[in-house]
Every structure is written in structure tokens, then in C-alpha cells.
């Protein structure tokens, strides 16, 4: 027969909860603390994610989901109305100014419709976008500053820029402007479509021009499905219209782009088991941390109220009903604890986020208010609460009325009696007491150990960030000076006008403090190598369609052996620069010999420094023939007519560049190397070889310095930084510089961010550990009040009792220290091996400093906490304590 007694059970639970006000306060605080942990971490994570996305969008140049590049007008009209597309925007690139004052800024002149302008952060704060049929233009305050024009509507400005190799000078009327954002790589001058077409007609460029992009249609889109699977949707749109983006040589190929700024797109494209495991492990860690404290709170409650639950059995209460009482109390307390934790967690996360983001260069500071934060934190906290009260509920449900009245913690455990010659000591009693409730002891020791392990992992993680490895990836020497265009993305190919004069080097050297330095000579002449057709195709397949490739091979000259002529990249390096190369195979010693006919073949590497051994054809010991071209003629293969320059070839004709006057020089490949990005050309597309600097000048007859790299003393670093900043800004703005100090600052900011995040998490987990330690001691003393009273009644001194409790506390601390040390030593190398695969600049260095600092703190807690708890419990007399239990 089923009795409807739910109302009675709820009343019992409510009244017993009202009688335990202290317990309620502790439980609410425990639940709130767990919710704070979830909410603050979710807030920080979501805020940093949003900030990273905004930062990434600015680096990408916009926040559209993806796009289709270099389209014909027909392809554009075909794709833009696909059902998967929610909104679309169109842009046509026209040209770029590269001369002073734009040599240090990336400025693009183009047409963009309203959607595209908005997605590129080109929303005028004053005025509007340009109207068709006018000479209007809109731009940002940085471009206006470079032009020396005040941001006033109606202002006229004139600018010269390159359009597909042709320089044009145009005058515009300012119709709108927006504030300059230094995080955005490219600045824009937006003009009407009619003016863009007129400029293309003026210079004689037919889209897509010689460069394959000028005047072509670029379609950017916002997808109906959002950012969850951008790449798949882009591919599906192409498939819907008979195109693809995988085989660059195929006639149906269209170049596409996925906005990597969306973390959802990154996860969908790069999701691997290690990422899933890492996220799951972090969530489980947080749940377990919250579980430890809430579980102990309810365990204390059940221990204190054990007689109450036993007596409920005498009036017919079932174990399931008693579990429901505890669960009801937990849910009621959650109604107070979870909202409090949500508010406090969001406020704490909101305060921590700016501190963390301030360490991250370029990340937009913002505090997320996403509903995901609050819903997720509330659900995780609720699950943690329900898990935490299950075992205490089972304990209450299992106890019988007689057992409840006689209950002493651990009293139900039966063990074999050991006979020994030694007497009982306070230490042995303390050890035995810990064994009476092994589950509680394990939970407490684990909780304390978790804090130590987490702190040690955090310190080892941030300590493993190798500044030398990070900085050397971007800057090989303390300072590197070059023409400003050499540091610009999309800048000019190195030429004679970009060379560093000796006078500039002399001015730098005159500052003093330079310990060593050297130059890298750049190629300003025509030079060819001859390669097989297979390598020619492999090296260029990403840039041409199959039809274009076949035509290119038809128009490419061959030598007597039938090998194809191909552009080659050469540089001459002094000893200082050669010292900074990474040797993959062979020996660089022969390149230190002036005049030696030896070269190093340059191989590409990935972000982790792993060489890509298929990025070059040359192998150790190969003979490379370099053809230094002094005079070239341009022959129409169909008519055989030769022209002196490409400009002389009729627009409707093809031509083959054929060397007329040249020198062939043979070199032996002495080494295979990787070049630091800071000393490289910073653009690719041709096989590259490095020569000795004197050999380079002797064989090429040129001496244009591309880079001057040098190191300084620590004392002179600051002065040199200040000098170069002023020199390149005010004295000689044609040149610019990079320094290790800049990248070191970025590195320290990133490391500080991880230290702050890890430190905050370690503090919260450590606080939970200390609270659990306090709870464990409190539970043990409360549950054994009668036992202590009996011991004192038969002659045990209060001092002895306190000593025994101190021993218990020290054993907890010792156990936590031992377990944390073992876990760190066992799992540290394994975990950090995985970290090293994620962060290419990570080098594992074990340090136990956190352990050595925290261990004495735990020992001190092991002494103070038991004494403090015992002092509050022992205020009653022995007789009162005996009567209280009986």
C-alpha cells in the first residue's frame, strides 16, 4: 500500500534544516564557493574567448564567417544567392600606396559595399560611405594623419598608389572617416565602384590583372548556420555550384578563406582527442573540487544528526525517504548558494579578466555576459551538489536506531587484533584514528594534495615557457634594422632602393655598446636555376590552375638538358648571420670561407620548428648551377619576334624571357638549413640558397644590404632602443627596426596571464583543501566527543589529547605532501610532454619549489587547526560531554 507522505517528509526536512542554522550557513557558503569557482572560470574563459575572437577578427581584417576570393563577376553572381548564405558582402581590391609616408603602414584602396565595410570595421563615425558617380572616399584617422589631412567632411586629399604594377595619382573628397584601430593590420581607403572601374581603365588593367587579384570580385559571407562548421559550409556552397577549393590546378577551382578568428571554426577544424580530454579533465577537476567540500559539509551534518535519522526509523521512515530529506535540504540550500555564487563569480571573473587580458597584447578587454556562463555554472553546481549528498544520504539511510544512539565514527569497522611488545603511544593512537574512517581520510588528503599538485603544475607550466626559444623564433639578434617595407606584409619585393647604406650602419655603430653584428645581402638582380618539370609543377601548383600551369610551362625557357628555368632566391650572409642558422644536415664551415663555391639550401619549417623536408629539391652534395642574368630579351613564341622589355610586347601577345647575356656559376650544397623568420626574405615562392657574403658580392656584382642585425650589451639595450625608435621615426623614416625587447615583453605578458589564471585556480582549490581539512578535523572531534570524555575520565591529560590531535593533523599534512610529490613526479613528465606538443616554445624543467613552500604551511595548519577546534569543543566539562551523548 502506497502512503502519500511527501508533505510530511518535506516538513521534517524543512524543520530539521531550520534547527541546524550553523550547518546551513556553512553549506550555503560551500555551495556558493563551488558556484563561484564555476562562474568565475567560465566568465574568464568566455571573456578571454570573446576578446581573442575580437582580436583575431582585427588581425584577419573582418568578422565575416568566410569568403570566396579572386572571382570573376559571373562567379560572384552565381555564388552570392546560395541558400546557405544569410548575408553577403563584396569587395574589389584596386591598389596600395607603398612610398613614404605609407612605407610603414599597410593601406589598401578598394571598393566595398555596406555589408563588407561593416564587417571590416569601416563604419564611419562621421559622415558616410562614398556614393556612386562621385570622387568621394572614406578612410580612417591614421591614413588622414599620414596624408596631413584634418578629419573634416569635404576635405580634399591626393594620394599615389600602385595598381597592378602601375603607379597612379588620384584626388578624392573625404565623405566619412572612422577612428584608427592599431590592432587591425590593414588600413582602408574606400572608393565608389564607378571610381574603381575608372582607375582600372586608366591604367589599362583587366581584372584580375597580372597579379591575379587586382579588380577581381571577392565575396564574403555570413552563414545561416553560424560559425560552428564554416569550412564545411563553404565547401558545400562551392559544390552546389560545381566548384571546389582543393585542387588548385583544376579549372573549377575557387580560392576560399575561413575566418580563423572564430574559435568555433578552429575547434571544428582542429578538434582532436587531446583537446576533448583536456577540457573534460578540467571540468572534472572543478566538479571534484566542489564535491570535496560539499560532501564533507553534509557528512558533518549526518554525523551530528545521526541519532535523529536513527529515531526516524522507529516511526517508520524508509531509507529512501531519509535520502530524500537530505536531498531536499541540499536543493533548498542550493536555492540560496547558487544565485549568490553566480553573482559573486561573475563579479570576480569580471575583475580578474581585465588583469589577465592586460597581459595579452592585442586582446580586446571585455567581460562576457553570455547566458552560457550562468546556465552552465548553475547546472554544474547543481550536479555537484546532488553528487555530494548521495553518500551522506546512504549513510543516514543505512543506520539503525540502536546503532545511531551508540554511533562513534569508524566504530562499525572490525579488524584483527595485533599483538605487539610495544605499548600504545600517542602517535600510534593518532595513526589508528585516521584508519577508522578511511574514506574521510582519503578525501581530505586528496583535497589537500590536489591543491599542491595544481600549484606545482602551474609553476612548472609557466616555468617551462622558454623565452629564448620564443624570442629567437621572431628575433635572432637584439636588434634588426631594414627598410620599413621589408617588415610590411604585402610590401615591395626587396630591391636596390631598399638597401641599407653604410652611412646608416655607421650611425648605429657610433652609439656604442654593440658586441657583435653582421649584414645579410639581398638579391637585386636576375638569377635563374634549372629544375625538372615535376618540381616546377610541385613548387607552383598552389598559385596556378592546371590550364595556367600548362601555359606557363609552354612559355618557360629550357636549357640544353631540357630543364625549366625558374626564379631563384639568393642571399649573402656574414659570419654573424650564419651563426643563427639551424643546420638540418651537413656542415656550414665551408660557407665561412670567403670566395668558396658552396651554398646552403634553405628549407621551410612549421610553427614548432620541425623542418618540412619536401620544401626543397636540393640535397647534400648536389651541384647547383646558378645563371646570373645580365641581359634578357622577351620572345613571342608564336612569331619569334624578340622585344627588349616586357612593356614592348603587344598586349595580345605572349612572351618567353630568354637570357641573352649571362654567367653560369656552379656551387656545391654544403648544408641544408632553416633560416629564422627575422633573417629571411619574409616572402616565399622560389627555391632559396645562402652564400658567403663575400662570395655573394663577388659573383653577383651587387652589395645591397637587406638587414643589419646586431647584439648589444645589457647596459646598452635601453639606449639603443631609444635611439632606433627616434632615428627611424624622425631622422630616417625610410627604415624601421625590430628588437628582442618587444617580443620578450609579449612573452612575459603571456606567461603572466597563465601564472595569474593558474594561481587563482590553485588558490581556490587550496582554499577548498584547507576547508576540507578543517571539516575533517571538526568531524572527527565532534564524532568522538564521548570517546575523548571517556579517555579524560580515566586519566588522560588534556595536553596528551591535544598532542594526539596535533599528530593526526600532521599525519594529514604528511600524507598530502607525500601523495602530491609522487603524483607530480609520475604524471608531470607525461602531462608536460603533451603541453610541449601544443606550445612550440615550451621546455620542461621540473621544479619542486611550490611543494617545498606549501609543505611547511600544511604542517603549520596540521598543528593549529586541531588545537583551535579542540579548544572550542572542550569548553564543556567532562561530565557535561558524557551526559550530552548519553
Task: Indicate where each model-derived feature is located.
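Basic-flanked hydrophobic alpha-helices used for secretion and membrane insertion
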Residues: 46-266, 463, 470-758
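N-terminal membrane-entry
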Residues: 269-286, 372, 748-765
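Hydrophobic multi-pass inner-membrane translocation pores used for secretion
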Residues: 754-768, 779, 788, 822, ...
